[in-house]
Amino acid sequence: MNKKKKSIVIFTGPSGVGKGTVEQLVFNYDELNLSLSCSATTRSPRGGETNGIHYYFISKEEFKDRIKNKKFLEHSFHFDNYYGTLYSELDNIIARNKVPFLEIETNGAKIIAQKMQKLKNPPYNLITIFLSPPSITDIYKRIKNRGTENAQTIKNRVNKAKEELLEAGNFKYVVYNDRPERAAQEIREILHKELDID
């Protein structure tokens, strides 16, 4: 079977590291044939976010029902909300001969990697990429400049980011986001190698 068809890109890093910015640049490289996997969440949409594009915004009751029915590859609870990757989303992307690109929280990425390691014949080739910030100060500034969180939430996110940075070594690739364009180019090179793109 084609290696590219079975591959899944797991893109993670702390809140405020600039994943969204770098991701947009990576998606400009058409030859990578990526398709963003839309996660489900119970949090409220931020300005400009659309259901089914940025996230599937669902109730906590519906989310818990899907957990019970084993509809998630992974799910986690943080910042008072659930987040998860639906098997159906991955299946739909792979059926279109695209490579699923999951931008997910660090703990969710670890759960997927651990789950695949336990399997004798894992169904996916995982390409795990951790985006690292220049400094914690940069994380603080980015989150504050969003203008969507209060002071306590910002503090919580920065503290969580410090914890997540300790996990960077658990991922196959660590990309330093000193400049988004450079980080995106490095990810492009990683994916060319991993997906056997000439």
From Swiss-Prot:
Its EC number is 2.7.4.8. It is an enzyme of class 2 (transferase). InterPro entries: GK/Ca_channel_bsu (IPR008145), Guanylate_kin-like_dom (IPR008144), Guanylate_kinase (IPR017665), Guanylate_kinase_CS (IPR020590), P-loop_NTPase (IPR027417). Residues 6-192 form the Guanylate kinase-like domain. It is found in: Cytoplasm. ATP binds at residues 13-20. The keyword Zinc does not apply. One of its GO terms (molecular function) is ATP binding. Keywords: ATP-binding, Cytoplasm, Kinase, Nucleotide-binding, Transferase. PANTHER family: GUANYLATE KINASE (PTHR23117:SF13), GUANYLATE KINASE-RELATED (PTHR23117). Essential for recycling GMP and indirectly, cGMP. Belongs to the guanylate kinase family. This is Guanylate kinase. The gene is gmk.
